């Protein structure tokens, strides 16, 4: 598609077609024109953007919304605070203060929150739309690694012959530790022999889908499960979840996905893609706050509860159980007969933190006002504009960095990972910090830049590239 707004030739295409920019696209005026034509521009006002002064301060400071804002491209690490968070938190605290324990079951008419005991389901309803699932297949609970442990306990069923887990060569350390510990938990299994790392070719960072399928073929007779990141945290590569899941299933593997960097970033269709299970955090692109409550997905085929053998003999997928996973209709009978909630809710353990769920529901209320497809459309354009400006008037030989994130929009999310030439990382990081630009650096030489469609602008992308070029020239 082509947009012509205010005389500006807009970007073309989203679905696998890289946006194309005109000759004048490298100008500040063009970036401003893109912002003026942005249908999601008003969402920026729903967030508190740290001021340049505050971002440099080492003392507590009240947010100064009218002040000169910093450029915040670190939503892949921690998203910004929604203005709704304070409103929701005030309602939660007032509920607790005014009616105490009755907050568990009482619906306050003028509160944006449901009673505490169903707030996890309130969040699940919103999250299900972001992952392409039925609400019953999703639940808000725990944190990413604890949820991963719970699901590995249910889905990793090694035998003497099928015991291997296939995983990413540069998996986030917590995923690696979780897998390693589950393998070691089973007598006779050695993580060194049962963990298969899938990596790129020498000198490369992108892992082609065909290579993943080939490794599945190579280990199919011995592999029990594959766990990959939806988006690789270091390189920003977005894996072909549908193709990999379907192929792994055809070889008899269970399939799980860590969606830490994919949730609220790219469009997902977990139910349609027949994913067995998935986990994610909510403090990155979902903006629910540092260490906020995570989420998990269990496909409906694994969440069924069968009472054909009697009310006291439900048949269900084995899991590590807790009382909050019990059916609400009988939860308070306290008869020590576990009857799980059908679906993902049956994997809950303890009473959910209403305080954490308050922050999560506040952030999700913003997503309820748009759609992941609309956000993704802008994200593709923002990141393509960033890539365009970074590469303009340079060659592989002249530029002091390499973009190790795939260039195809279908194979990446919001993030671009820049691998700097040796010795540049700290200098560039210091320059960006002094300019009140917040992005993420990863040793030994990567800067991860992630413009978020909810609150970042094309003008900020332009300013970032100007500051980055200045840092290289110093």
UniProtKB/Swiss-Prot annotation:
Provide the positions where the record notes the PTM N6-(pyridoxal phosphate)lysine. 284
Q: How does it assemble?
A: Homodimer.
Family of the protein in this entry = Belongs to the kynureninase family.
The UniProt function text for this chain reads: Catalyzes the cleavage of L-kynurenine (L-Kyn) and L-3-hydroxykynurenine (L-3OHKyn) into anthranilic acid (AA) and 3-hydroxyanthranilic acid (3-OHAA), respectively.
Q: What SUPFAM superfamilies would the database entry show?
A: PLP-dependent transferases
- What enzyme category does the UniProt record give? hydrolase
The UniProt record lists the EC number as 3.7.1.3
UniProt key word Cytoplasm: yes
Swiss-Prot/TrEMBL GO biological process terms: 'de novo' NAD biosynthetic process from L-tryptophan; anthranilate metabolic process; L-kynurenine catabolic process; L-tryptophan catabolic process to kynurenine; quinolinate biosynthetic process
Matching entries from InterPro entries are given as: Aminotrans_V_dom, Kynureninase, PyrdxlP-dep_Trfase, PyrdxlP-dep_Trfase_major, PyrdxlP-dep_Trfase_small
Q: Name one Pfam family in it.
A: KYNU_C
What are the boundaries of the signal sequence?
Answer: none
Annotated residues for binding of pyridoxal 5'-phosphate? 144-145, 172-175, 258, 261, 283, 323, 351
Which pathway features in its UniProt record? Amino-acid degradation; L-kynurenine degradation; L-alanine and anthranilate from L-kynurenine: step 1/1; Cofactor biosynthesis; NAD(+) biosynthesis; quinolinate from L-kynurenine: step 2/3
The organism's place on the tree of life at top rank: Eukaryota
Q: What is the annotated localization of this protein?
A: Cytoplasm
> Molecular function terms in GO for this entry?
kynureninase activity; pyridoxal phosphate binding
Q: Does the keyword Cytoplasm apply?
A: yes
Q: What is this protein called?
A: Kynureninase 2
């Amino acid at each position: 598609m082509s947009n012509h707004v205010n005389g500006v030739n807009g970007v073309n295409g989203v679905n696998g077609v890289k946006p194309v920019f005109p000759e004048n696209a490298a100008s500040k005026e063009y970036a401003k024109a893109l912002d003026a034509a942005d249908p999601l521009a008003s969402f920026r006002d729903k967030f508190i953007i740290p001021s340049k002064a505050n971002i440099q301060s080492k003392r507590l400071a009240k947010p100064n919304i009218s002040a000169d804002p910093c450029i915040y491209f670190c939503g892949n690490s921690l998203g910004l605070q929604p203005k709704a968070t304070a409103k929701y938190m005030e309602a939660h605290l007032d509920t607790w203060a005014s009616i105490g324990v009755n907050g568990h079951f009482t619906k306050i008419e003028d509160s944006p929150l449901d009673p505490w005991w169903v707030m996890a389901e309130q969040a699940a309803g919103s999250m299900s739309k972001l992952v392409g699932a039925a609400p019953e297949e999703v639940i808000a609970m725990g944190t990413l690694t604890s949820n991963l442990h719970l699901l590995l306990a249910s889905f990793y069923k090694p035998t003497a012959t099928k015991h291997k887990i296939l995983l990413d060569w540069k998996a986030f350390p917590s995923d690696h530790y979780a897998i390693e510990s589950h393998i070691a938990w089973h007598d006779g299994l050695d993580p060194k022999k049962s963990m298969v790392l899938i990596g790129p070719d020498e000198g490369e960072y992108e892992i082609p889908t065909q290579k993943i399928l080939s490794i599945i073929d190579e280990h199919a007779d011995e592999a029990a499960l594959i766990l990959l990141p939806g988006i690789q945290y270091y390189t920003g590569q977005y894996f072909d979840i549908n193709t990999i899941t379907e192929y792994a299933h055809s070889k008899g593997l269970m399939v799980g996905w860590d969606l830490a960097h994919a949730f609220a970033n790219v469009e997902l269709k977990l139910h349609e893609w027949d994913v067995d299970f998935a986990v994610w955090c909510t403090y990155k692109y979902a903006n629910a706050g540092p260490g906020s409550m995570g989420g998990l997905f269990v496909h409906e085929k694994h969440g069924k509860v069968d009472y054909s053998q009697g009310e006291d003999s439900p048949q269900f997928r084995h899991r590590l159980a807790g009382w909050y996973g019990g059916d609400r209709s009988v939860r308070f009978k306290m008869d020590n007969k576990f009857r799980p909630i059908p679906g993902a809710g049956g994997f809950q353990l303890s009473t959910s933190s209403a305080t954490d769920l308050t922050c999560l529901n506040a952030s999700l209320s913003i997503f309820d006002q748009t759609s992941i497809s609309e956000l993704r459309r802008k994200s593709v354009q923002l990141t393509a504009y960033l890539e365009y400006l970074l590469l303009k008037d340079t060659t592989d030989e002249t530029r002091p960095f390499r973009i190790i994130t795939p260039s195809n929009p279908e194979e990446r999310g919001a993030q671009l990972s820049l691998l700097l030439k040796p010795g540049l990382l700290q200098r560039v990081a210091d320059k960006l910090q002094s300019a009140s630009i917040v992005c993420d650096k990863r040793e030994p030489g990567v800067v991860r830049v992630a413009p978020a469609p909810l609150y970042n602008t094309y003008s900020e992308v332009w300013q970032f590239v100007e500051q980055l070029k200045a840092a290289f020239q110093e």
